[in-house]
Amino acid sequence: MTLLDTMVVVYARTPDSPFHQWAKEQIAGAVAGSGAAINAVTLAELCAEEGMEAAEVAHQIAGIGIEVFDVPASAAARCGEAYRNYRRQRKRESDKDSPKVPLPDFFIGAHAEIMGWELATNDPRRFQNYFSLKLVMP
């Protein structure tokens, strides 16, 4: 199974994106192979996009064969641990604070790691630094 980072789905729906073709190919390849998935965090991010109704987003996602999964409870502790490490490193390197609540990428990365899934992303920085998982990148 390939878990899709939110921006992979966004880029696949954005013809003028420099990652449009790559994103479409990743989704199509995953759907035809072991499966393509997003989680509830990604679904929320997609539904937050201006002008997008939740029913329309769900219809589009299902229409191209992407499965939607809840984030497993077992990923919560891993998400928190990775985000805590990120906050410490950010504070140490830049003396800047981060929000106390984990950013969406940490839920997505923890989910992929816990499930043993690969993760398709065009922005590997946080995933490489805080998780042990296979990344699919342009």
Q: What are these model-predicted stretches?
A:
Residues 62-64, 130-131:
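Short, structured coil segments at secondary-structure junctions
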Residues 1-38, 47-60:
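Short, well-structured N-terminal submotif of metal-dependent ribonuclease cores
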Residues 53-57, 86-88, 136-138:
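Short, hinge-like loop/turn segments at secondary-structure boundaries
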Residues 1, 109-138:
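Acidic, PIN/NYN-like endoribonuclease modules and their adjacent C-terminal/linker elements
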Residues 8, 42, 75, 108, ...:
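Alpha-helix capping/helix-boundary segments
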Residues 67-122:
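Active-site neighborhoods of divalent-metal-dependent phosphate/nucleic-acid chemistry enzymes
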Residues 6, 40, 102-106:
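Conserved glycosyltransferase catalytic-site signature
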Residues 35, 65-67, 118, 134:
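Conserved beta-strand segments of alpha/beta enzyme cores
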